[in-house]
Amino acid sequence: MWTISEVPIQRENDAESLKEEVAEAWAFVKTQPWLFAGIAMFMIWHIGDSAIEIGIPFIVENKGLGAKEFGIFGAVGAGGAMIGSLLAGIRPIPQKTRGLVFYVLIGGIAWCMLMWAMPIPFLLILVFVLIEGILGGTLGVIWRTTMSDSVDQHLRGRVNSLDAIGSLIFIPFAPLMGGWMIETTNVLTTFALAVSVMVLTTMAGLIVPSFRRFERIETDLFPIKDSRTQSD
């Protein structure tokens, strides 16, 4: 591997600096309503999601359970995500309905999270954890597929970076807020408020047609190239 020479990547109008590369990616994001809305919504959505994650150990503890059950909780969610990813890979979502399905799944995830805090048996909570994992796994495949279909290869890494920054930017703040709310009120109230924020935020994706239309919009600055392929 050390002896293999580096093959330079040839790009048209290659950006000369990191600042220019990020500016180019941001310029592309602003031309795509579905992408801009998705990044903006997840900036807010992850505030509620992170606050909920802080409350999970208290849910387990309040039921008189311990670390083993907390581990089972995490394992069931991860298993659900694997199932969801597999199902979405076997039966891809058609592009024309991809955005609608995406935002419906987000709402489903939020409601499943609210059920975790309800006074129900732990086994029933695990059912909702499994469903949340399946929906989340499917959601991830839809978003990654759309990014692959709609973003040119030379922009994909930078756009993915902006997407990740948008998702993570409020996460350092959200656990602090979640812990404070749980301490001040209780787990159920915190979960209810977090889910309300998550659902209200993503409602825009269902209401505004351009947000749920997961299709590349051609512009003079970013024309659609014939070589770019679309997934089913």
Describe the role of every protein-language-model region.
Residues M1-Q10, A204-V208:
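C-terminal membrane-cytosol helix-exit motif in multi-pass small-molecule transporters
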Residues I4-S5, W34-A37, D49, A67-K68, ...:
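A short alpha-helix capping/helix-coil boundary motif
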Residues E6-I39, P223-D232:
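Juxtamembrane intracellular "pre-TM" segments in multi-pass secondary transporters
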Residues P8, L35, E53, R212-R213:
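Charged, solvent-exposed alpha-helical segments that act as regulatory interaction surfaces
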Residues A23, K30, I44, I56-P57, ...:
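C-terminal transmembrane bundle of multi-pass solute transporters/carriers
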Residues F42-G48:
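Mobile cap/lid helix-loop segments that border enzyme active or cofactor-binding sites
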Residues G48-I54:
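Extracytoplasmic gate region of multi-pass secondary transporters
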